[in-house]
Amino acid sequence: MFNFRLFSRRGKSLGLLAIVLLLFGFYSLKSSMPVYSNSIGSPSAHSSSYKGVSKAKTSPQDPDSVVMLIVSFDDHYDSSRSDSSSVFLDKVLSDRTEYALRHGYTLVHKKARDIQARYGVYGTWSIIPALRETLAEYPDAGWIWLLDAKAVIMNPSESLKDRVLKPEKLSQHLLLNSPIDPLKNYIRTRRKMDPSDVFVITTSDYNGISTRSLLIKNNNFAPFLLDAWNEPLLKSAGFDQAERSALSHLLEAHNTILDHVALVSPKVLNSYTNSAVDLNYEEGDFLVILQDCENAAACERIFDNYYQQRKLPAIKKQLSEETVDEQS
């Protein structure tokens, strides 16, 4: 005898399975397409004047124009001062100002606490919406350069173009077929890369891919990457290296993203203090990331030490009453 009850149960199960497969297919298709978020404010939504720092004008589609982004966190401020000021951060901004003025770049300062309040993100995850805001605010910039506040530009006379953005320079510095994460040797950069296909330039260290000195080309790929990187599922995944691990996961899971991310030697964009020989700062390196400073006072002492060692050819352009967007 035909078992109608069994047939009914099987039919329901197959129906549910079909729905799940359809939803999965729709989500996969959606996630593979560029996403343009409307959650970011208008170009002037979070802008205010910051006296003494450079704001350069960029021409439409200028491939050499750069917006330098610095995101400051609470540990960059002096907790002993009631006005929440920071001698350390002032020195960092002065260093970045000098570099921006010299090369005609724009400098943007965003406070992590304000980013966190606007978007409900925490810790270093705030660099992602900070980058996304900057893209919206400067649509004509060629590149966005996110550089950690705990860094000193040691060779301010060298432009990013001459350092790494020229195709011949980028080709020279590319790490091809190189592990992105030392614990996942199978995740590697491409064996061949055309500089014209490179939309993200960064480095890796013993903790995997780094976000402390990162360049993102301002094209259609940038919002696609940042929106994928900012997915709530990634933020709730409990990655041990937060946004760094999330970016590594995206490179592992999405060939479209991996195709456009280039690694260069840490010595090119991201030398460290107190690190292994292949990562440690040496005289002549472009910049140095300050390790092992957990508060503004400690960072200031280390900053001063390296700041005095910089290469300082004569600066032709004096600091003036120009402005930079400080996000508040």
Curated annotation (Swiss-Prot):
Its EC number is 2.4.1.-. One of its GO terms (cellular component) is Golgi apparatus. It holds the Pfam family Glyco_transf_34. Residues 1-32 form the signal peptide. It comes from the Eukaryota. Belongs to the glycosyltransferase 34 family. This is Uncharacterized alpha-1,2-galactosyltransferase C8D2.17. It comes from Schizosaccharomyces pombe (strain 972 / ATCC 24843).
